């Protein structure tokens, strides 16, 4: 897959994001990521055992701690359009 200006513009539209700085650098980084994933697809993993966790017995449990957090507000503050606690995005499916 070739990452170019046309594809980057399409990704911007679908994701409702704007990439304004260093577009050429962004294209180069996306191309590197795609090439890395292609290399991962070439790995022969048929002889490898399927694992869910690298820790024997599973991951240790942790104590849940309740914390006040404004993560929702912080994320929504970055959105170009929002209403209450939701993102407003353009309709892409008819």
Curated annotation (Swiss-Prot):
Disulfide bonds: none annotated. It catalyses: L-glutamyl-tRNA(Gln) + L-glutamine + ATP + H2O = L-glutaminyl-tRNA(Gln) + L-glutamate + ADP + phosphate + H(+); L-aspartyl-tRNA(Asn) + L-glutamine + ATP + H2O = L-asparaginyl-tRNA(Asn) + L-glutamate + ADP + phosphate + 2 H(+). One of its GO terms (biological process) is translation. SUPFAM superfamilies: Glu-tRNAGln amidotransferase C subunit (SSF141000). GO terms for molecular function: asparaginyl-tRNA synthase (glutamine-hydrolyzing) activity; ATP binding; glutaminyl-tRNA synthase (glutamine-hydrolyzing) activity. It is an enzyme of class 6 (ligase). Keywords: ATP-binding, Ligase, Nucleotide-binding, Protein biosynthesis. Transmembrane segments: none annotated. InterPro entries: Asp/Glu-ADT_sf_sub_c, GatC. Its EC number is 6.3.5.-. Belongs to the GatC family. Heterotrimer of A, B and C subunits. Allows the formation of correctly charged Asn-tRNA(Asn) or Gln-tRNA(Gln) through the transamidation of misacylated Asp-tRNA(Asn) or Glu-tRNA(Gln) in organisms which lack either or both of asparaginyl-tRNA or glutaminyl-tRNA synthetases. The reaction takes place in the presence of glutamine and ATP through an activated phospho-Asp-tRNA(Asn) or phospho-Glu-tRNA(Gln). This is Aspartyl/glutamyl-tRNA(Asn/Gln) amidotransferase subunit C.
């Amino acid at each position: 897959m070739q990452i170019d200006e046309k594809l980057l513009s399409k990704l911007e539209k679908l994701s409702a994001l704007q990439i304004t700085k260093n577009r050429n650098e962004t294209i180069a980084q996306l191309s590197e990521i795609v090439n890395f994933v292609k290399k991962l697809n070439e790995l022969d993993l048929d002889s490898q055992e399927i694992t869910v966790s690298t820790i024997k017995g599973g991951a240790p449990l942790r104590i849940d701690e309740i914390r006040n957090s404004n993560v929702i507000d912080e994320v929504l503050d970055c959105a170009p359009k929002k209403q209450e606690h939701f993102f407003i995005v353009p309709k892409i499916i008819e």
